[in-house]
């Protein structure tokens, strides 16, 4: 009986040892040996159990929607599954963040993985990487189309080029448009653009309801006029009240919108356009052709006018043409690159400027205290131009615009290609991995900004100096125009023009939206259209 009990005890002890070797060592052996010299127990040493080696987690270990052969994770957008709408992709990515965490894997039908980053530390690590030539994934449909048209394009353009060629285009083509000194020369002309826009709004609103229907169409015309004033150096007359615009001009904004939608569908769809000309590809080609034809015609007309008036042009007119002339006079670039760059700048500026204005207006009209404070900063400029000093001192207005950028940037996420191996959120990613930095979603988190879903311009005002500042906690993830060398070259122009437009509209009208603004994804974030605004004349 005693033998059986001893065997049973040994069996229990053996099982316990097998399952909890480290507990046995810590609880039983260490107390027995702690006061005993090594030589007293035949130099025996306690053998530590080896910690199991942790497997290195790679890209395919990242959580995300289930992958299906030949579809990847794109099945979530297909009609017969219809979990999500592609027009609400910004909301889709927010939902994936809630489901899977701060790092999510998306897989293309070609089995190419794309990693979505939501963690602030990961975003900063990727976007602040010191690179001479930051790499971002090219928009393949643009690359494919432009390579098929060597008669028009010598390269795939500044946005889609990479490496030294990108650097060459960037440094040559953007030096003027990014210069604060050059942009200040345009302030009087841009004031005039804003004034004409205000008069056009007055002419187009319903006299009884004071509602301007299809406001976005007029905003696009304003964007076209403002960008052409900058790039070509003279007013084009697109905001004239009594002049009927040519049909091609009215089609231009629609073509720009279609261009972005086709890019979205080509990037997030199944990619069949790569193998035969699908509707997505045909729509893109038509839009690209129309944009090129219309703006190219404007440029050619300006070149002829320039030749005629070069001898008698005054200094002011020559100053306004500085950007246009600087690009045309570049000797080391193909004329096709010069022309396509001007076309790209104008096309991108139309929708970006109009959408940014609408997002800012939506934010400030939703805050009852915002409009009076903006008005107080510009009330002395009712009958005069708003020049640089006024822009510099517009603390609250700039804070409102910055807060709108945080909540609804037109570029809500930024794409990069990793240039070296990185560990992000505990996963090891190899160089060459495509990552999407989900900055807007990160900006909506209370862990990054207190009251993150609320419109709070005051967060961008230094309480000590009462000046506008971007030196606040986590401001580095608010990047509506990109960051670093790959940032949008039109950033300064858009910021200056939006301040002017907001000031002029608040001086002229009490603005309200007939219906709350909704957003859609069109490769950039855009307002859902049509939009109607109620504009009541402001009485002082």
From Swiss-Prot:
Residues given in the record as heme binding sites: 488
Function: Required for CNS development; midline glial cells. Involved in the metabolism of insect hormones; responsible for all ecdysone 20-monooxygenase activity during embryonic, larval and adult stages. May be involved in the breakdown of synthetic insecticides.
Protein name: Ecdysone 20-monooxygenase
Keyword Cytoplasm included in the entry's annotation: no
The EC number(s) this enzyme carries: 1.14.99.22
One GO term describing the cellular component: mitochondrial membrane
Pathway connected to this protein: Steroid biosynthesis; ecdysteroid biosynthesis
GO biological process: border follicle cell migration; central nervous system development; dorsal closure; ecdysteroid biosynthetic process; growth of a germarium-derived egg chamber; head involution; midgut development; pupation
Miscellaneous field: Member of the Halloween gene group.
Keyword Iron set for record: yes
């Amino acid at each position: 009986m005693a033998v059986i009990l001893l065997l049973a005890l040994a069996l229990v002890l053996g099982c316990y040892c097998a399952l909890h070797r480290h507990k046995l060592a810590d609880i039983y052996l260490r107390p027995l040996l702690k006061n005993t010299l090594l030589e007293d127990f035949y130099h025996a040493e306690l053998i530590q159990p080896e910690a199991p080696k942790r497997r290195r987690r790679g890209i395919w270990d990242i959580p995300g929607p289930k992958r299906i052969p030949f579809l990847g994770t794109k099945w979530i957008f297909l009609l017969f599954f219809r979990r999500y709408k592609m027009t609400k992709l910004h909301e889709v990515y927010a939902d994936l963040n809630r489901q899977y965490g701060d790092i999510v894997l998306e897989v293309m039908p070609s089995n190419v993985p794309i990693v979505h980053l939501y963690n602030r530390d990961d975003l900063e690590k990727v976007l602040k990487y010191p690179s001479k030539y930051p790499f971002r994934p090219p928009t393949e449909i643009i690359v494919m189309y432009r390579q098929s048209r060597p008669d028009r394009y010598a390269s795939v353009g500044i946005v889609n080029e990479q490496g030294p060629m990108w650097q060459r285009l960037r440094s040559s083509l953007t030096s003027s448009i990014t210069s604060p000194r050059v942009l200040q020369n345009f302030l009087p002309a841009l004031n005039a653009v804003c004034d004409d826009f205000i008069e056009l709004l007055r002419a187009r609103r319903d006299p009884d309801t004071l509602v301007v229907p299809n406001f976005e169409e007029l905003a696009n015309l304003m964007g076209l006029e403002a960008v052409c004033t900058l790039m070509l150096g003279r007013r084009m007359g697109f905001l004239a009240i009594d002049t009927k615009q040519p049909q091609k001009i009215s089609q231009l904004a629609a073509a720009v919108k279609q261009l972005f939608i086709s890019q979205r569908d080509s990037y997030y769809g199944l990619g069949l356009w790569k193998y035969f000309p699908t509707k997505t590809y045909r729509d893109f080609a038509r839009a690209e052709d129309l944009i090129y034809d219309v703006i190219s015609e404007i440029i050619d007309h300006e070149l002829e006018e320039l030749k005629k008036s070069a001898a008698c042009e005054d200094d002011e007119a020559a100053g306004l043409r500085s950007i246009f002339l600087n690009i045309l006079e570049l000797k080391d670039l193909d004329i096709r690159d010069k022309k396509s760059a001007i076309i790209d700048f104008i096309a991108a500026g139309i929708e970006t400027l109009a959408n940014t204005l609408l997002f800012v207006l939506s934010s400030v009209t939703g805050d009852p205290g915002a409009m009076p404070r903006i008005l107080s900063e510009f009330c002395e400029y009712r009958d005069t131009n708003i020049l640089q000093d006024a822009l510099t001192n517009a603390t609250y207005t700039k804070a409102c615009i910055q807060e709108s950028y945080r909540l609804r940037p037109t570029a809500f996420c930024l794409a990069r290609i990793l240039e070296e191996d990185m560990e992000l959120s505990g996963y090891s990613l190899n160089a060459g991995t495509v990552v999407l930095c989900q900055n807007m979603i990160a900006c909506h988190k209370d862990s990054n900004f207190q009251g993150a879903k609320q419109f709070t311009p005051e967060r961008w005002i230094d309480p000590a100096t009462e000046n506008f500042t971007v030196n606040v906690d986590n401001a580095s993830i608010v990047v509506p125009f990109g960051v670093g060398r790959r940032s949008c070259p039109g950033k300064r122009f858009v910021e200056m023009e939006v301040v002017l437009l907001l000031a002029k509209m608040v001086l002229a009208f009490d603005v309200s939206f007939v219906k709350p603004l909704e957003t859609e994804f069109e490769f950039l974030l855009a307002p859902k259209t049509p939009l109607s605004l109620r504009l009541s004349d402001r009485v002082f």
